[in-house]
Regions:
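Structural alpha/beta surface segment adjacent to cysteine/selenocysteine redox centers
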Residues: 1-88, 156-165
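C-terminal cap of thioredoxin/glutaredoxin-like
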Residues: 63, 67-165
Length: 165
């Protein structure tokens, strides 16, 4: 519901605490939790590049994160009727490597630098308050942060109690 309102522009950066190095014309990534994490980051980078709207990519990311593996990525794509071949081509080719490098540059350019993941930035800022609020109730955080006319979906977040008549 929130994505269709236009009050949120969400970006996911599946890079985490990885480190990159260059070997020839290729980038090599070492992920904090090993090769499987790097594999899933690469799959997610390709999916995010190919599916531009959160209503398209969020169901895939959610599905993949339930069981992060290449075989589950293919299953998720099938379940969600997403063509696997372009993702596979990206994943296995130079495009995926380039996308991961771009994610590294964006992650490393964060100010302040990220200290953990997930690292939440709202309106170009990161604070502990933003982090805590967004992680505990993203809908409420977005609705409270948005300065324009609040959409209907935000009205339900303002009521914490419902008293008897």
């Amino acid at each position: 519901k929130l994505f269709s309102t236009g009050i949120i522009d969400i970006g996911l950066y599946p890079y985490g605490n990885a480190v990159e190095s260059q070997e020839g014309d290729k980038w090599v990534f070492q992920c904090q939790h090993g090769e499987a994490e790097c594999q899933n980051n690469l799959i997610e980078a390709c999916v995010l590049h190919m599916l531009s709207h959160p209503s398209q990519f969020m169901p895939f990311i959610y599905c993949l994160e339930q069981n992060p593996s290449l075989s589950n990525a293919m299953t998720c794509a099938s379940k969600l009727k997403i063509e696997w071949a372009p993702i596979s081509n990206c994943y296995n080719g130079t495009q995926g490597n380039h996308l991961m490098h771009e994610l590294a540059l964006e992650t490393n350019a964060l100010n302040p630098p990220h200290q953990f993941v997930p690292w939440i930035v709202a309106n170009g800022q990161h604070t502990e308050e933003i982090q805590s609020s967004a992680q505990s109730d993203l809908l409420q955080f977005v609705c409270q942060t948005y300065t324009g006319v609040k959409p209907d979906v935000c009205q339900s977040t303002s009521q914490k109690r419902c008293y008897k008549n």
